[in-house]
Regions:
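Electrostatic cytochrome c docking/interface patches
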Residues: 17-35
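Bacterial N-terminal signal peptides that target proteins for export
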Residues: 1-8
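Short, solvent-exposed mixed-charge patches
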Residues: 109-110
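The canonical Cys-X-X-Cys-His
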Residues: 32, 39-47, 100
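Detector for the c-type heme attachment site
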Residues: 43-50, 66, 80
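Extracytoplasmic electron-transfer domains, predominantly the class I c-type cytochrome c fold
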Residues: 57-105
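Bacterial N-terminal signal peptides
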Residues: 8-17
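Conserved catalytic-core motifs of eukaryotic protein kinase domains, centered on the activation segment
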Residues: 53-55
Length: 110
């Protein structure tokens, strides 16, 4: 688990250096939360304060939000790269990506 966190942190740190772009536009936190509850909650703990995901290997959304180097650009890459072997091959619209990113990053306040 620790090695995975370090690898994810390194990837996010690299993409955190990417200049601001359209991918960093603000999304709708409430729509992102609803999408997460509808689509992501079967594997991830998506609610604020929830730390134990239904799938033991899936990080909670709060863990993702607090990953060093986590930025909107890093989340955009993660949500659109479709290269994570255990995640379903979801195709999100640019607005859905912004919404989920906005919700995830809002969890830093908890």
């Amino acid at each position: 688990m620790r090695m995975r966190t370090l690898i994810v942190s390194a990837v996010f740190s690299i993409f955190g250096m990417v200049p601001a772009s359209r991918a960093q536009e603000i999304g709708d936190v409430q729509q992102g939360r609803q999408f997460a509850l509808d689509v992501c909650a079967s594997c991830h703990a998506v609610r604020a304060g929830a730390t134990q995901s239904p799938l033991a290997t899936a990080p909670s959304f709060e863990e993702i939000a607090h990953t060093p180097g986590m930025t909107p650009a890093a989340l955009t890459f993660w949500l659109t790269a479709q290269s994570h072997p255990t995640m379903p091959n979801l195709i999100l619209s640019p607005q859905q990506v912004r919404n989920v990113s906005a919700y995830l990053l809002s969890l830093r306040d908890n």
